Amino acid sequence: ANRELRKLNHEHIFIYPFLEENGLNLDSVTPGLQEFSLRYKQDVRLKEVIERLGNNYLSDGDTLLHGDFYPGSWLHTSDGVKIIDPEFSFYGLAEFDVGIMLAHLHLTRQPPAIFELVENNYSKSLTFDNELLDAFTGIEILRRIIGLAQLPLSLALPEKKQLLEKAVSLLKK
């Protein structure tokens, strides 16, 4: 389901951020980020891990996913939280949407209590894979810092470097 938009999203998550020449000068976002990003764009082993993860993303699953589950798709209304922009929805791996959400909690420097709240309130299936969850969390952190889909993050270069290292550690578990 929704194969074309999933392929488009795949390119923006798993391919474009790791091209050395992708049309985005990261120094225009954060001075020094372009050169620092090369360690990820030139890491052959990391790119192999990312390719396998991308294939997992493209595989069919049994969970209906939003497909772009980040704060820009969450609206707080008087009736509670509403989720918008379902155009990337598809049946896939539950770990994907949860990983995207957790990545954005990292990117916005949420306190540990928020992560505990998610852990304690998300009902995981018996087949839920925590390593896959970590990998999807890591790839989203990487793509939002060194990819084309930039966000208005109030993070200095040292903070971005720290998050990038965390992302790689999540991916390479």
Language-model regions: role of each:
Residues 127-137:
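All-alpha amphipathic helical-bundle segments outside canonical DNA-binding/catalytic cores
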Residues 150-173:
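Regulatory N- and C-terminal appendages and interdomain linkers associated
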Residues 1, 39-56, 106, 113, ...:
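N-terminal secretory/membrane-targeting helices
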Residues 82, 99-101, 162:
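Glycine-rich, phosphate-binding/catalytic loops in enzymes
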Residues 1-53, 146:
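Active-site catalytic-loop/activation-segment of kinase and kinase-like phosphoryl-transfer enzymes
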Residues 48-96:
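Active-site acidic catalytic loop and adjacent metal/ATP-binding pocket
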Residues 94-125, 138-156:
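Active-site activation/catalytic loop segments of kinase-like enzymes and analogous catalytic loops
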Residues 77-80, 124-129:
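Short glycine/proline-enriched coil/turn segments at helix->beta-strand junctions
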